[in-house]
């Protein structure tokens, strides 16, 4: 099943919007590329809704939060929900209250991040 999912992903090569932190931006872009998709890293609140609208999915990594990126994350998450795009919060346990108004379709976390 996972093999089929990756084959489907690679055949479509979707553009994936990533709002990540400064520590992992390169790693996140490389992971998206390794899965067969194309990353775009955009976190300015003035553009995130437009960027999310042209992408096939949204990845939000909240490793180092700040007020600017939190605003961008919430705007992008709401837009992804409106469009029915899949999206994912990484390191979600500390921010469950933030996720409540914009529920993600996928949540990821590591034991070391909890």
Task: Annotate each predicted stretch with a short phrase.
Residues 22, 45, 93:
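Residue-level "edge-of-site" marker
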Residues 40-49:
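Active-site-flanking structural segment that lines cofactor/substrate pockets
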